C-alpha cells in the first residue's frame, strides 16, 4: 500500500495494521506487537477486537496512517539490506578462504547484532520472499512518484536483481 493511501481516502474511521502473514517471525499466529495507524479512538476499538480474538497478549503501537503504512516497508527494507550484506560478506569470506559460518558466529556474538537473516545459502545468494519481492519495488515506486531518492534501498534492490540473474 503506497504511503498516503489512507490519507487520500479522507475517512477518519480507517485503521491500518500492516500485515505480517506467512512464515515471518511476526506472523499473525503469534505476534509480539501490532501496529495500528489512525485515529486513536478507533485504534483502541481495534485493540479491543484483538483482545477478544487473540487474548491481546502483545504490545500495541498507535501511530498515524502514514507511519503505519511506512513501518512495514522500513522493516522489510532492513531485512533485505541485511540479507544482501551477509551474502556480500559470504563472498568476501570465500575469496579470503574463510568459512562464512565461522565469520557469522563472530558477527552475531555481538549483542547489538540480531542473528536473524544472517544465514546464507550458496544456491540462493539473494532474498526471495513474497513480502520482500513486493514491498521493496513498491516502496521504490512510491518514492519515485513523490520525488524521493532512497539510494541505499535502490542499490540493495539492484544488487538482489543482479544476484538472481546469475
Please give the residue ranges for each predicted region.
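Structural/interface elements that position substrates and couple domains in central-metabolism enzymes
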Residues: 1-166
